């Protein structure tokens, strides 16, 4: 287990401050170049937002590495973690892209299928599109996208298209994460923030009168997953979905270098991976603090918040994989 210290000042150690504050700190706006592609089902358009580096094409492919970010639930290229990572990737001289899951990034779905935490076929499809254009691909996934990427790395093994992966704040055991989210603060603060937008999108989609009634009564993510996510994506119940979509059982099968970063105080997570749960190609980096995709520090010399802990760990890991 890697021990790379993350030690914020005492007044930043609260997990809820770590989780909520980044949304208000990141002010940079980035000029992404957007391309639309069809999803793996050839039903819906999905948006890929690129930041390109100066590069040359050799045999039709860019030679500098591409860093791919798989966003979290209801995330996008405008999420604070995407913009923070993008700046570091630009500084390193690499290409950057955020492929959005179906219905995210402002592009509505055309079919009945949205996205879920275990849809590795969709990730493989996205990476396949990118492999046609880029010689070297590194991938990072956060939260829901982190679980999907970790599962992908184990499920696809040597066929995984990216050279290596970094997984951050991932609910690799979805059932226990669902329980964690239903605790008092999670239910009062985080659940409405995540649940309300996705319910609104679902209500705008092709749904029955019974589904509409049930969705309007949903009070937690478990309700939504039982009513909508599970049946829409071929699972018989939320428990079936959580069991099949969780990355934890697949971590032993990972054969390409993978770094999993988790804060012990993450309010979104339940059971997390331990050394005996993963293959020899997986590095576990566990910090005492950091919240959920937070990891905010403070530089007293410059009197500024620092949000580069995760991007720096990720880029160092990618460069070490070469």
Model-found features: residue ranges?
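N-terminal cap/lid segment of alpha/beta-hydrolase-fold proteins
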Residues: 11-60, 305
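Short beta-strand element of the alpha/beta-hydrolase
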Residues: 63-72
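Short amphipathic alpha-helix adjacent to the substrate-entry channel of hydrolases
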Residues: 80-98
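Catalytic nucleophile-loop/oxyanion-hole region of alpha/beta-hydrolase
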Residues: 86-88, 102-138, 304
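Alpha/beta-hydrolase-fold enzymes
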Residues: 133, 138-233
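Active-site nucleophile elbow and catalytic-triad environment of alpha/beta-hydrolase enzymes
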Residues: 227-250
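Short beta-strand/loop motif that positions the catalytic acidic residue
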Residues: 254, 260-262
């Amino acid at each position: 287990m890697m021990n790379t210290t993350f030690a914020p000042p005492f007044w930043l150690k609260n997990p809820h401050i770590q989780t909520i504050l980044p949304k208000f700190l990141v002010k940079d706006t980035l000029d992404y170049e957007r391309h639309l592609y069809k999803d793996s089902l050839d039903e819906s358009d999905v948006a890929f937002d690129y930041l390109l580096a100066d590069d040359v094409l050799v045999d039709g492919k860019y030679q500098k590495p591409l860093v791919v970010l798989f966003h979290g639930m209801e995330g996008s290229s405008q999420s604070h973690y995407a913009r923070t990572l993008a700046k570091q990737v630009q500084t390193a001289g690499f290409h950057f892209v955020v492929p959005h899951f179906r219905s995210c990034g402002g592009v509505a779905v055309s079919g009945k299928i949205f996205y879920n935490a275990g849809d590795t076929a969709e990730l493989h499809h996205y990476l396949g599109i990118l492999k046609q254009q880029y010689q070297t691909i590194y991938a990072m996934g956060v939260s829901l996208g982190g679980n999907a990427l970790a599962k992908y790395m184990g499920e696809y093994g040597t066929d995984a298209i990216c050279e290596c992966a970094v997984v951050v704040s991932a609910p690799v055991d979805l059932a226990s994460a669902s329980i964690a989210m239903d605790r008092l603060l999670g239910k009062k603060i985080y659940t409405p923030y995540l649940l309300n937008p996705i319910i609104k999108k679902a209500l705008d989609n092709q749904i029955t009168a019974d589904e509409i009634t049930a969705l309007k009564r949903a009070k937690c993510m478990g309700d939504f997953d039982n009513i909508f996510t599970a049946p829409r994506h071929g699972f018989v119940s939320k428990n079936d979905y959580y069991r099949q979509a969780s990355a934890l059982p697949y971590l032993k099968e990972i054969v390409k270098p993978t770094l999993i970063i988790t804060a012990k105080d993450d309010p979104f997570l339940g059971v997390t991976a331990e050394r005996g749960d993963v293959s020899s190609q997986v590095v576990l980096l566990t910090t005492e603090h950091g919240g959920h995709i937070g990891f905010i520090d403070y530089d007293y010399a410059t009197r500024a918040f620092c949000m580069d802990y995760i991007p720096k760990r990720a880029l160092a890991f990618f460069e070490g994989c070469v």
